[in-house]
Regions:
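N-terminal, polar/charged subdomain of small-to-medium soluble alpha/beta proteins
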Residues: 1-117
């Protein structure tokens, strides 16, 4: 079992339902934790065949986030989690999405979800 983390992935998307949020992209910061089954042979071979490719899933997350609009932080988080869980090798995943400056006196607001098989 391996634990893969993608930390502080900074992306821009349409997130929210207020008029200003509907008109302008905003920053979101995404943290992903993936527990995946990686065969021992793949680790011993030191080759990319058979491993969980974090670059591939990161590109998919980027595409999902940047190419869509979301009213709710919760829906964005769930969509990312569902995308990650499509890979059968993933045993457990956790996704946290921060929306910086969502509240006047707070650095950010975040929503976190996890899924297990």
């Amino acid at each position: 079992m391996a634990l893969i983390r993608v930390k502080n992935l900074l992306l821009r998307t349409f997130i929210g339902f207020n008029p200003e949020e509907l008109a302008n992209k905003q920053d979101v910061v995404i943290n992903i934790e993936i527990e995946a089954d990686i065969p021992e042979e793949a680790l011993l071979a030191d080759e990319p065949v058979g491993i969980y490719n974090y670059k591939t899933i990161t590109k998919q997350v980027i595409e999902l986030v940047q190419d869509n609009r979301f009213k709710l932080l919760e829906v964005l988080t769930k969509n990312i989690l569902d995308l990650i869980m499509l890979d059968e090798r993933v045993c457990h995943a956790r996704v946290e999405v921060d929306k910086p400056h969502a509240l006047r006196f707070a650095e950010s607001v975040s929503f976190e979800m996890e899924a297990k098989r």
